[in-house]
Amino acid sequence: MAARLCCQLDPARDVLCLRPVGAESCGRPLSWSPGALPPPSPPSVPADDGSHLSLRGLPACAFSSAGPCALRFTSARRMETTVNAPQSLPTTLHKRTLGLSPRSTTWIEEYIKDCVFKDWEESGEELRLKVFVLGGCRHKLVCSPAPCNFFTSA
């Protein structure tokens, strides 16, 4: 079973953050609307420990209250800077967390929607997800089962 993470835009830093949703949560957050400030992380989710989630091979920063730095690094590498990211990308990711059907217009939106979120939600374990999330992050992994060669696993 895949752990649930919600994607939120941090307008103060112009970055996208993944935040763990507690096991006791019954659904995806619906209170945030595009253009509004994202809701704070659920208080029932520990900010420093990912052992309650079923994901493995994620960097330790994935469970921080600020969200994983890996996503910020990967976004910066693929889109030059996170500030220059397409304005529709946060909307697309937000729609995906709500289970809506976003109309993506760029290759990076399609990549995230189809290769990352879909495989993550449906199978819970996807090599391309690991490559995307771990790329560029220097934090230690959480419960990593074995070393992985990210250059040959995609």
UniProtKB/Swiss-Prot annotation:
Keyword Transcription attributed: yes
InterPro entries referenced in this protein's UniProt entry, alphabetically: Transactivation_prot_X
GO CC terms, sorted: host cell mitochondrion; host cell nucleus
Location of region: Mitochondrial targeting sequence: 68-117
Keywords: Activation of host NF-kappa-B by virus, Activator, Apoptosis, Host cytoplasm, Host G2/M cell cycle arrest by virus, Host mitochondrion, Host nucleus, Host-virus interaction, Modulation of host cell cycle by virus, Transcription, Transcription regulation
Modification after translation (UniProt): A fraction may be phosphorylated in insect cells and HepG2 cells, a human hepatoblastoma cell line. Phosphorylated in vitro by host protein kinase C or mitogen-activated protein kinase. N-acetylated in insect cells.
Gene Ontology BP terms: DNA-templated transcription; symbiont-mediated activation of host NF-kappaB cascade; symbiont-mediated arrest of host cell cycle during G2/M transition; viral genome replication
Location of this chain's protein in the cell: Host cytoplasm; Host nucleus; Host mitochondrion
Predominant location category: host cell
Coiled-coil features, chain-numbered ranges: none
Keyword Disulfide bond: no
Subunit and partners: May form homodimer. May interact with host CEBPA, CFLAR, CREB1, DDB1, E4F1, HBXIP, HSPD1/HSP60, NFKBIA, POLR2E and SMAD4. Interacts with host SMC5-SMC6 complex and induces its degradation. Interacts with host TRPC4AP; leading to prevent ubiquitination of TRPC4AP. Interacts with host PLSCR1; this interaction promotes ubiquitination and degradation of HBx and impairs HBx-mediated cell proliferation.
Family, per entry: Belongs to the orthohepadnavirus protein X family.
Role summary: Multifunctional protein that plays a role in silencing host antiviral defenses and promoting viral transcription. Does not seem to be essential for HBV infection. May be directly involved in development of cirrhosis and liver cancer (hepatocellular carcinoma). Most of cytosolic activities involve modulation of cytosolic calcium. The effect on apoptosis is controversial depending on the cell types in which the studies have been conducted. May induce apoptosis by localizing in mitochondria and causing loss of mitochondrial membrane potential.
Name of the molecule in the record: Protein X
